[in-house]
Protein backbone atom coordinates (compact mmCIF):
# COMPACT_ATOMS: atom_id res chain seq x y z
CA UNK A 1 0.00 0.00 0.00
CA UNK A 2 2.77 2.43 0.91
CA UNK A 3 5.66 1.06 -1.18
CA UNK A 4 6.14 4.09 -3.45
CA UNK A 5 5.81 6.59 -0.61
CA UNK A 6 8.18 4.63 1.61
CA UNK A 7 10.76 4.75 -1.17
CA UNK A 8 10.38 8.55 -1.22
CA UNK A 9 10.73 8.71 2.56
CA UNK A 10 13.92 6.69 2.51
CA UNK A 11 15.31 8.82 -0.33
CA UNK A 12 14.94 11.97 1.77
CA UNK A 13 18.13 13.29 3.42
CA UNK A 14 16.25 13.61 6.72
CA UNK A 15 17.03 10.96 9.31
CA UNK A 16 16.22 10.32 12.92
CA UNK A 17 15.48 8.28 16.00
CA UNK A 18 12.05 6.75 16.59
CA UNK A 19 10.71 5.82 20.02
CA UNK A 20 7.47 3.89 20.62
CA UNK A 21 5.42 3.29 23.76
CA UNK A 22 2.06 1.54 23.66
CA UNK A 23 1.60 1.43 19.89
CA UNK A 24 3.08 2.21 16.50
CA UNK A 25 4.95 -1.05 15.89
CA UNK A 26 3.30 -1.48 12.50
CA UNK A 27 4.66 1.84 11.24
CA UNK A 28 8.16 0.91 12.37
CA UNK A 29 7.80 -2.46 10.62
CA UNK A 30 6.73 -0.70 7.41
CA UNK A 31 9.78 1.57 7.54
CA UNK A 32 12.16 -1.29 8.27
CA UNK A 33 10.57 -3.54 5.66
CA UNK A 34 11.20 -1.15 2.79
CA UNK A 35 14.59 -0.99 1.02
CA UNK A 36 16.74 1.94 2.12
CA UNK A 37 15.55 2.10 5.74
CA UNK A 38 19.07 2.90 6.95
CA UNK A 39 18.79 6.22 5.15
CA UNK A 40 15.91 7.26 7.42
CA UNK A 41 16.33 5.40 10.68
CA UNK A 42 19.33 5.95 12.93
CA UNK A 43 17.87 4.04 15.87
CA UNK A 44 14.57 2.78 17.26
CA UNK A 45 13.63 2.32 20.90
CA UNK A 46 10.61 0.77 22.63
CA UNK A 47 10.48 1.84 26.32
CA UNK A 48 7.26 -0.09 26.92
CA UNK A 49 7.17 -0.39 30.71
CA UNK A 50 6.77 2.55 33.09
CA UNK A 51 10.30 2.07 34.39
CA UNK A 52 11.74 1.96 30.87
CA UNK A 53 9.94 5.18 29.94
CA UNK A 54 11.20 6.84 33.12
CA UNK A 55 14.74 5.80 32.23
CA UNK A 56 14.36 7.13 28.67
CA UNK A 57 13.00 10.52 29.76
CA UNK A 58 15.11 10.93 32.88
CA UNK A 59 12.04 11.21 35.12
CA UNK A 60 8.62 9.60 35.42
CA UNK A 61 5.95 11.47 33.42
CA UNK A 62 2.71 12.50 35.10
CA UNK A 63 0.90 10.48 32.42
CA UNK A 64 2.44 7.93 30.07
CA UNK A 65 -0.07 8.74 27.34
CA UNK A 66 -0.31 12.48 26.80
CA UNK A 67 0.75 15.09 24.31
CA UNK A 68 3.31 16.45 26.76
CA UNK A 69 4.92 13.03 27.22
CA UNK A 70 5.02 12.39 23.47
CA UNK A 71 6.69 15.76 22.92
CA UNK A 72 9.27 15.09 25.63
CA UNK A 73 10.02 11.70 24.06
CA UNK A 74 10.51 13.30 20.64
CA UNK A 75 12.82 15.97 22.10
CA UNK A 76 14.97 13.32 23.78
CA UNK A 77 14.98 11.27 20.56
CA UNK A 78 16.18 14.33 18.63
CA UNK A 79 19.08 14.82 21.02
CA UNK A 80 19.91 11.14 20.63
CA UNK A 81 19.93 11.56 16.83
CA UNK A 82 22.36 14.46 17.21
CA UNK A 83 24.59 12.32 19.41
CA UNK A 84 24.60 9.57 16.77
CA UNK A 85 25.29 11.97 13.89
CA UNK A 86 26.43 15.31 15.34
CA UNK A 87 27.23 16.81 11.93
CA UNK A 88 23.67 16.41 10.64
CA UNK A 89 21.63 18.44 13.15
CA UNK A 90 19.80 20.29 10.36
CA UNK A 91 18.60 16.95 8.93
CA UNK A 92 17.99 15.01 12.15
CA UNK A 93 14.62 14.44 13.81
CA UNK A 94 13.14 12.66 16.80
CA UNK A 95 9.79 10.91 16.28
CA UNK A 96 7.74 9.49 19.14
CA UNK A 97 4.49 7.64 19.64
CA UNK A 98 2.70 7.02 22.91
CA UNK A 99 -0.67 5.28 22.80
CA UNK A 100 -3.42 3.72 24.88
CA UNK A 101 -5.14 1.32 22.48
CA UNK A 102 -7.83 -1.30 22.98
CA UNK A 103 -6.68 -3.71 25.66
CA UNK A 104 -7.90 -6.73 27.63
CA UNK A 105 -7.68 -4.96 30.99
CA UNK A 106 -9.57 -2.12 32.64
CA UNK A 107 -8.10 1.27 31.81
CA UNK A 108 -9.09 4.86 32.47
CA UNK A 109 -9.74 7.13 29.53
CA UNK A 110 -10.56 6.84 25.86
CA UNK A 111 -8.45 4.94 23.35
CA UNK A 112 -5.99 7.53 22.07
CA UNK A 113 -2.51 8.18 20.74
CA UNK A 114 -0.07 11.04 20.40
CA UNK A 115 2.59 11.34 17.70
CA UNK A 116 5.28 13.98 18.09
CA UNK A 117 8.15 15.00 15.84
CA UNK A 118 10.86 17.42 16.90
CA UNK A 119 13.76 18.75 14.86
CA UNK A 120 15.92 21.85 14.66
CA UNK A 121 13.32 23.86 12.75
CA UNK A 122 9.92 22.82 14.12
CA UNK A 123 7.96 20.74 16.63
CA UNK A 124 4.82 18.81 15.63
CA UNK A 125 2.15 17.11 17.71
CA UNK A 126 -0.57 14.93 16.19
CA UNK A 127 -3.34 13.94 18.62
CA UNK A 128 -5.61 10.99 17.81
CA UNK A 129 -8.74 9.90 19.66
CA UNK A 130 -10.71 6.84 18.64
CA UNK A 131 -14.39 7.66 18.85
CA UNK A 132 -17.14 5.31 19.94
CA UNK A 133 -20.27 4.73 17.83
CA UNK A 134 -23.67 5.49 19.28
CA UNK A 135 -24.81 2.52 21.33
CA UNK A 136 -27.24 1.19 23.84
CA UNK A 137 -26.31 1.63 27.51
CA UNK A 138 -25.72 -2.10 27.94
CA UNK A 139 -23.10 -2.20 25.13
CA UNK A 140 -19.42 -2.17 26.09
CA UNK A 141 -18.52 0.81 23.87
CA UNK A 142 -16.02 -0.59 21.38
CA UNK A 143 -13.86 1.94 19.53
CA UNK A 144 -12.29 -0.59 17.19
CA UNK A 145 -10.08 -3.63 17.55
CA UNK A 146 -6.43 -3.16 18.34
CA UNK A 147 -5.52 -4.26 14.82
CA UNK A 148 -7.83 -1.60 13.37
CA UNK A 149 -6.38 1.05 15.65
CA UNK A 150 -2.81 0.06 14.77
CA UNK A 151 -3.69 0.44 11.08
CA UNK A 152 -4.86 4.01 11.75
CA UNK A 153 -1.80 4.74 13.85
CA UNK A 154 0.53 3.42 11.16
CA UNK A 155 -1.10 5.67 8.56
CA UNK A 156 -0.93 8.74 10.80
CA UNK A 157 2.68 8.16 11.87
CA UNK A 158 3.91 7.75 8.32
CA UNK A 159 1.72 10.69 7.30
CA UNK A 160 3.34 13.02 9.85
CA UNK A 161 6.79 11.85 8.84
CA UNK A 162 5.87 12.52 5.20
CA UNK A 163 4.61 15.99 6.08
CA UNK A 164 7.96 16.72 7.71
CA UNK A 165 9.76 15.54 4.58
CA UNK A 166 7.45 17.50 2.22
CA UNK A 167 6.14 14.28 0.68
CA UNK A 168 2.47 13.98 -0.25
CA UNK A 169 0.72 11.28 1.76
CA UNK A 170 -2.48 9.61 0.44
CA UNK A 171 -5.81 9.74 2.23
CA UNK A 172 -7.23 6.45 3.44
CA UNK A 173 -10.50 5.13 4.84
CA UNK A 174 -10.65 2.93 7.92
CA UNK A 175 -13.35 0.81 9.51
CA UNK A 176 -12.79 2.50 12.87
CA UNK A 177 -13.83 6.09 13.60
CA UNK A 178 -11.28 8.53 14.94
CA UNK A 179 -10.44 12.21 15.15
CA UNK A 180 -7.00 13.63 14.39
CA UNK A 181 -5.52 17.06 14.96
CA UNK A 182 -2.03 18.34 14.16
CA UNK A 183 -0.38 21.34 15.80
CA UNK A 184 3.07 22.76 15.19
CA UNK A 185 5.47 25.45 16.39
CA UNK A 186 8.00 26.85 13.94
CA UNK A 187 11.10 28.05 15.77
CA UNK A 188 12.71 31.45 15.17
CA UNK A 189 16.35 31.33 14.15
CA UNK A 190 17.76 32.20 17.59
CA UNK A 191 15.83 29.32 19.20
CA UNK A 192 17.16 26.96 16.55
CA UNK A 193 20.73 28.06 17.15
CA UNK A 194 20.44 27.53 20.90
CA UNK A 195 18.67 24.18 20.38
CA UNK A 196 21.63 22.71 18.48
CA UNK A 197 24.25 24.56 20.57
CA UNK A 198 25.38 26.81 17.74
CA UNK A 199 24.90 29.60 20.30
CA UNK A 200 25.15 29.46 24.09
CA UNK A 201 22.27 31.88 24.56
CA UNK A 202 19.87 34.01 22.55
CA UNK A 203 20.90 37.08 24.61
CA UNK A 204 24.10 38.38 26.20
CA UNK A 205 25.56 41.44 27.88
CA UNK A 206 23.37 43.17 30.49
CA UNK A 207 20.77 40.38 30.24
CA UNK A 208 23.17 38.18 32.22
CA UNK A 209 23.79 40.40 35.26
CA UNK A 210 21.01 38.88 37.38
CA UNK A 211 19.32 35.67 36.24
CA UNK A 212 16.48 33.59 37.65
CA UNK A 213 16.91 30.05 36.24
CA UNK A 214 13.96 27.67 36.25
CA UNK A 215 11.65 25.38 34.33
CA UNK A 216 8.63 27.62 35.07
CA UNK A 217 6.19 24.80 34.41
CA UNK A 218 3.97 26.56 35.22
CA UNK A 219 4.85 30.06 36.35
CA UNK A 220 3.30 30.76 39.77
CA UNK A 221 3.03 33.53 42.33
CA UNK A 222 6.12 32.32 44.18
CA UNK A 223 8.27 32.87 41.09
CA UNK A 224 6.95 36.40 40.64
CA UNK A 225 7.47 37.34 44.28
CA UNK A 226 11.03 35.98 44.18
CA UNK A 227 11.76 38.15 41.14
CA UNK A 228 10.34 41.27 42.81
CA UNK A 229 12.31 40.72 46.03
CA UNK A 230 15.51 39.92 44.12
CA UNK A 231 15.24 43.18 42.19
CA UNK A 232 14.70 45.11 45.42
CA UNK A 233 17.69 43.48 47.13
CA UNK A 234 20.15 43.66 44.21
CA UNK A 235 19.04 46.84 42.49
CA UNK A 236 19.27 44.93 39.21
CA UNK A 237 16.73 43.87 36.62
CA UNK A 238 16.12 40.15 37.03
CA UNK A 239 15.83 38.17 33.79
CA UNK A 240 14.30 34.70 33.70
CA UNK A 241 16.63 32.01 32.32
CA UNK A 242 15.09 29.01 30.58
CA UNK A 243 17.44 26.19 29.60
CA UNK A 244 16.50 23.75 26.85
CA UNK A 245 18.33 21.06 28.80
CA UNK A 246 17.76 20.63 32.53
CA UNK A 247 19.39 18.34 35.05
CA UNK A 248 17.04 15.43 35.93
CA UNK A 249 14.33 16.62 33.49
CA UNK A 250 13.53 15.95 29.82
CA UNK A 251 14.79 18.55 27.35
CA UNK A 252 12.31 21.06 25.96
CA UNK A 253 10.72 21.21 22.54
CA UNK A 254 9.40 24.35 20.85
CA UNK A 255 5.87 23.94 22.23
CA UNK A 256 7.29 24.11 25.75
CA UNK A 257 9.61 27.01 24.96
CA UNK A 258 6.76 28.98 23.38
CA UNK A 259 4.36 28.25 26.24
CA UNK A 260 6.79 29.20 28.98
CA UNK A 261 8.17 32.31 27.33
CA UNK A 262 4.60 33.49 26.74
CA UNK A 263 3.75 32.89 30.40
CA UNK A 264 6.81 34.88 31.46
CA UNK A 265 6.47 37.70 28.92
CA UNK A 266 4.10 39.76 31.06
CA UNK A 267 6.52 39.58 33.98
CA UNK A 268 9.90 40.27 32.39
CA UNK A 269 12.52 39.24 29.86
CA UNK A 270 13.44 35.58 29.27
CA UNK A 271 16.93 34.44 28.27
CA UNK A 272 17.03 31.08 26.44
CA UNK A 273 20.12 28.91 26.96
CA UNK A 274 21.30 25.35 26.51
CA UNK A 275 23.12 25.28 29.85
CA UNK A 276 21.72 22.67 32.25
CA UNK A 277 24.35 23.11 34.99
CA UNK A 278 25.40 26.21 36.88
CA UNK A 279 29.02 25.91 35.81
CA UNK A 280 27.81 26.11 32.19
CA UNK A 281 25.57 29.08 33.02
CA UNK A 282 28.48 30.78 34.80
CA UNK A 283 30.77 30.40 31.78
CA UNK A 284 28.16 32.11 29.61
CA UNK A 285 27.39 34.82 32.18
CA UNK A 286 30.47 35.51 34.35
CA UNK A 287 29.97 37.82 37.37
CA UNK A 288 26.24 37.07 37.38
CA UNK A 289 23.97 36.82 40.39
CA UNK A 290 21.67 33.78 40.21
CA UNK A 291 18.31 33.78 41.98
CA UNK A 292 17.68 30.25 43.27
CA UNK A 293 15.76 28.19 45.82
CA UNK A 294 17.64 26.39 48.55
CA UNK A 295 16.75 23.02 46.99
CA UNK A 296 18.67 24.08 43.88
CA UNK A 297 21.60 25.24 46.03
CA UNK A 298 21.80 21.79 47.65
CA UNK A 299 21.93 20.16 44.21
CA UNK A 300 24.79 22.46 43.17
CA UNK A 301 26.78 21.02 46.08
CA UNK A 302 25.93 17.34 45.50
CA UNK A 303 28.79 15.16 44.26
CA UNK A 304 26.45 12.95 42.19
CA UNK A 305 26.13 15.71 39.58
CA UNK A 306 29.90 15.90 39.08
CA UNK A 307 31.18 12.33 39.38
CA UNK A 308 33.69 12.86 42.20
CA UNK A 309 34.56 15.13 45.11
CA UNK A 310 37.51 16.56 43.24
CA UNK A 311 35.43 17.47 40.18
CA UNK A 312 32.78 19.07 42.40
CA UNK A 313 35.42 21.09 44.25
CA UNK A 314 36.98 22.19 40.96
CA UNK A 315 33.59 23.35 39.67
CA UNK A 316 32.89 25.32 42.85
CA UNK A 317 36.33 26.92 42.61
CA UNK A 318 35.55 27.93 39.04
CA UNK A 319 32.26 29.51 40.15
CA UNK A 320 34.29 31.61 42.58
CA UNK A 321 36.84 32.54 39.91
CA UNK A 322 34.00 33.59 37.59
CA UNK A 323 32.60 35.92 40.23
CA UNK A 324 29.26 34.14 40.63
CA UNK A 325 26.90 35.08 43.46
CA UNK A 326 23.71 33.31 44.62
CA UNK A 327 20.65 34.97 46.12
CA UNK A 328 18.98 32.09 47.95
CA UNK A 329 15.30 31.73 48.87
CA UNK A 330 14.11 29.23 51.48
CA UNK A 331 11.68 26.43 50.73
CA UNK A 332 9.37 24.08 52.56
CA UNK A 333 10.89 20.59 52.82
CA UNK A 334 9.15 17.71 54.63
CA UNK A 335 7.16 20.11 56.78
CA UNK A 336 10.09 22.36 57.70
CA UNK A 337 11.17 25.62 56.08
CA UNK A 338 14.84 25.33 55.10
CA UNK A 339 17.36 28.15 55.02
CA UNK A 340 21.17 28.32 55.02
CA UNK A 341 21.39 27.91 58.80
CA UNK A 342 19.76 24.47 58.56
CA UNK A 343 21.83 22.90 55.79
CA UNK A 344 25.45 21.89 55.35
CA UNK A 345 27.19 22.89 52.13
CA UNK A 346 30.77 23.43 51.02
CA UNK A 347 32.36 26.51 52.57
CA UNK A 348 33.38 27.88 49.18
CA UNK A 349 29.78 27.69 47.96
CA UNK A 350 28.33 29.16 51.16
CA UNK A 351 30.67 32.13 50.76
CA UNK A 352 28.98 32.97 47.43
CA UNK A 353 25.47 33.00 48.94
CA UNK A 354 23.14 35.59 50.43
CA UNK A 355 20.03 34.23 52.15
CA UNK A 356 16.63 35.91 51.88
CA UNK A 357 15.04 35.69 55.36
CA UNK A 358 11.80 33.76 55.88
CA UNK A 359 10.25 37.00 57.18
CA UNK A 360 10.80 38.49 53.72
CA UNK A 361 9.79 35.48 51.61
CA UNK A 362 7.83 32.31 52.22
CA UNK A 363 5.61 30.70 49.57
CA UNK A 364 4.67 27.05 50.17
CA UNK A 365 3.85 26.32 46.53
CA UNK A 366 5.64 24.44 43.76
CA UNK A 367 5.25 23.92 40.03
CA UNK A 368 5.41 20.15 40.62
CA UNK A 369 2.30 20.27 42.82
CA UNK A 370 0.46 22.50 40.37
CA UNK A 371 1.26 20.13 37.46
CA UNK A 372 0.12 17.09 39.45
CA UNK A 373 -3.16 18.79 40.38
CA UNK A 374 -3.76 19.79 36.76
CA UNK A 375 -3.06 16.23 35.56
CA UNK A 376 -5.47 14.73 38.11
CA UNK A 377 -8.17 17.18 37.07
CA UNK A 378 -7.66 16.28 33.40
CA UNK A 379 -7.85 12.55 34.16
CA UNK A 380 -11.06 13.04 36.14
CA UNK A 381 -12.78 14.72 33.18
CA UNK A 382 -11.46 12.44 30.41
CA UNK A 383 -14.24 10.40 28.79
CA UNK A 384 -13.97 6.69 28.19
CA UNK A 385 -13.57 3.47 30.10
CA UNK A 386 -13.38 3.57 33.91
Regions found by a protein language model. Name each.
Residues 4, 22-26, 68, 72, ...:
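Conserved active-site and cofactor/substrate-binding residues in soluble primary-metabolism enzymes
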Residues 11:
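Hard-cation-handling environments
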Residues 17-66:
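Glycine-rich, small/polar surface segments that engage phosphate groups of diverse ligands
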Residues 56-83, 257-272:
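Short, structured active-site "lid" loops
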Residues 2-3, 8, 30-33, 51, ...:
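Nucleotidyltransferase catalytic core that binds NTPs
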Residues 14-17, 268-269:
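Short active-site oxyanion
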Amino acid sequence: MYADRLAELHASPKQGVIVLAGGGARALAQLLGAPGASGTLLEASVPYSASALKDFLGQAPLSSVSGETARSMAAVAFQRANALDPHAAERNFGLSITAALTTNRARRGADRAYIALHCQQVSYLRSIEFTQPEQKPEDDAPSGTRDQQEAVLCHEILGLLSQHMDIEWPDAKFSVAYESRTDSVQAPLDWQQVMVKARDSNQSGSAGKCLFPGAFNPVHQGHLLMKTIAEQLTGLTVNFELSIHNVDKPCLDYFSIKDRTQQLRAHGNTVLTNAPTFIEKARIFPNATFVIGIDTLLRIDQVQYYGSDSLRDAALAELTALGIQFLVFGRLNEGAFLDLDQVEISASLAARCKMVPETVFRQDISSTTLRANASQAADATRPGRP
